[in-house]
A protein has these predicted regions:
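Juxtamembrane boundary at the C-terminal end of a transmembrane helix
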Residues: 364-374
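Short linker/helix segments within small regulatory modules
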Residues: 16-24, 101-108
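Short Cys/His-rich micro-motifs in 6-15 aa windows
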Residues: 30-37, 114-121
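Short cysteine-rich clusters marking metal-coordination/redox-active sites
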Residues: 8-11, 26-29, 92-95, 110-113
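Short functional micro-motifs and their immediate structural scaffolds
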Residues: 14-16, 34, 100, 118
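Extended hydrophobic
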Residues: 311-361
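Charged, low-complexity helical/coil segments in non-catalytic cytosolic or luminal regions
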Residues: 127-323, 328
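Residues immediately within or flanking Cys/His clusters that coordinate Zn2+
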Residues: 3-5, 21-23, 87-89, 107
Length: 374
């Protein structure tokens, strides 16, 4: 697997995508580069180096040798190395240190030199995304959003808002499936018009029933499903929506300076759930064309998919998790819009103190009321 380290064309320092400038920036010589310049520069550089395929082949051969050696070890050694086998190890192209990742990680940061590392082969071939929405919210702005939410929480534990939590805030690109469809549909429905009036003490109701026929072309865009297992579903769903008008054709350089995950849920695994949702949307769209009725009940509905397009998309999320009283609490911020989602801990001591203050205030009011009536 090839590791890619995007370096500044001017000084060779690490190059990262800057959400504020929407350009690629070097923190050392303060240079900024457009996405096109970066792509052209590294495309020319890649032609002078060994191809990623050759490197991957070598590592595959090495992995086979290691697997053969591992097979000869005893059961005890296998048990001890189980955790190591589940991880994947690469060498940092900047300092040579070992970078340990999970099987789905596509971009990360070297723990030792803090330089960004992009695992090129993870997002190539069939796993290459169609598009990416770059981070628009910088880490500092994400921290400001986090602090803004914390200020509204009166019962946070003391010293909860600290630098250690800010350090853990990580920008991650998560994979999603997006589907656009065009359908031709026909509907037969029963429409009711109800009219009521009063004459004297009598109340009258008239119900007229109509047979409705509708036909037309329906377009449903941007129906999404997550493409990664093992993550908090609510967290990844609730930071939506994203403005897909700001999506770019995928380029590996956008991952520099952030973490990224490769999909491990395939299109066929979510197709049924997506179709069920689109069916519901389409039927509701057809019902909405029958206006002016008190009630509309579908009698017969059928449609045909005329066009369908799936897009494998990476979306930006700022993520932090923290442990409080043995419970892991996730917090996420939409890296494009700043929308927040998460659960913040509650201090039992502050709750008790607040309850005591309220009780004391009520008791004081009761005593005051009693004195007034003496």
């Amino acid at each position: 697997m090839a590791t890619v380290n995007y370096t500044c064309p001017n000084c060779a320092a690490p190059l990262k995508f800057n959400p504020d400038k929407q350009m690629f920036s070097c923190e050392y010589c303060m240079s900024d580069f457009t996405e096109k310049y970066v792509q052209d520069f590294f495309a020319n550089k890649e032609q002078k180096e060994n191809s990623a395929e050759k490197q991957e082949k070598k590592e595959q051969e090495k992995a086979k040798e290691n697997a053969a050696k591992q097979a000869q070890s005893n059961d005890s050694a296998q048990a001890e190395n189980k955790t190591e086998e589940e991880a994947v190890i690469y060498n940092c192209p900047s300092c040579g240190a070992q970078v340990v990742t999970t099987a789905s990680t596509a971009a990360t940061t070297c723990f030792y030199c803090q330089n960004p590392v992009v695992l090129g082969g993870r997002l190539s071939g069939e796993f290459k995304p169609d598009r990416v929405i770059p981070f628009k919210l910088s880490k500092q702005k994400a921290i400001d959003k986090f602090l803004e939410m914390c200020k509204r929480k009166w019962f946070l534990p003391k010293n909860f808002v600290s630098e250690k939590h800010f350090d853990k805030l990580t920008g991650v690109y998560f994979p999603y499936w997006y589907v656009d469809e065009q359908r031709s549909a026909q509907m037969v429905a029963k429409g009711e018009k109800v009219r009521s009036w009063t004459v004297g003490d009598d109340r009258y109701t008239e119900t007229k029933v109509f047979e409705l026929h509708r036909a037309g072309d329906l377009i449903v865009n941007n129906v999404f499903e997550r493409a990664l297992k093992g993550q908090d579903r609510d967290m990844l769903q609730c930071v939506h929506p994203y403005d897909l008008g700001e999506a770019h054709p995928f380029a590996m350089s956008y991952l520099s300076g952030f973490q990224a995950e490769k999909r491990d849920i395939e299109q066929n695994e979510v197709a049924q759930a997506v179709q069920t949702r689109i069916n519901g949307y389409c039927q509701q769209l057809m019902k909405d064309t029958a206006s002016g009725y008190s009630a509309v009940q579908i009698q017969n509905y059928n449609d045909k998919i005329e066009l369908e397009k799936w897009n494998y998309t990476l979306l930006p999320v700022w993520v932090v998790t923290y442990k409080y009283r043995g419970k892991i609490l996730p917090f996420a911020i939409n890296g494009q819009t700043g929308k927040t989602y998460g659960e913040l801990p509650t201090s039992a001591g502050k709750l008790l103190a607040f309850a005591a203050i309220i009780a004391a205030a009520l008791m004081a009011l009761g005593l005051l009321g009693g004195l007034l009536f003496l």
